[in-house]
Amino acid sequence: MTDLRIGHGYDVHRLTEGRRLVLGGVEIPWDLGLLGHSDADVLTHAVMDALCGAAKLGDIGKLFPDSDPRYAGISSLELLRQVAALLKKGGWAVVNVDATLIAQAPKVGPCRREMEANLAAVLGVETDRVNVKATTEEHLGFTGDSSGMACHAVCLLMRL
């Protein structure tokens, strides 16, 4: 029997002035950015948590604690590289990743393909194995009033 594992990740960050908005390693021009210890890339964080969950590696808070100064301002793609190395060491291959960004603004559709390409490159998979979507919550809740952004991600891993 093939050993397959499904993982789910969720992340949320507050939007604030004076920070860059980075999603999937792409800097999005906007007047607000996500607040966090690293670059606060909510998309990449959700993807990492999905991958960690599927491989039983815990979560990114365990692997990259916000109390550790080594991770202050770090690119989340660099953290994803470290997760990808742990997956490889554990004998796991990424079958696919699917993520849904939740935000009222800005519109990220024009940058989706670049985000997918960045994530796929770090994970060492073809771009057709990574999908990024975006939706709003119709002005409801903290994402709807642009107080923050959220992201859900799922992945499928296969034991090599």
Question: What name fits each language-model region?
Answer:
Residues T2-R113, N118, V122-L123:
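RNase III-family endoribonuclease catalytic core
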Residues V132-T136:
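Pyridoxal 5′-phosphate
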Residues L140-G144:
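Positively charged, low-complexity, intrinsically disordered RNA-binding extensions
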Residues E126-R129:
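Short acidic capping loops at alpha-helix termini that bridge into adjacent secondary structure
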Residues D145-L160:
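C-terminal edge-of-domain segments
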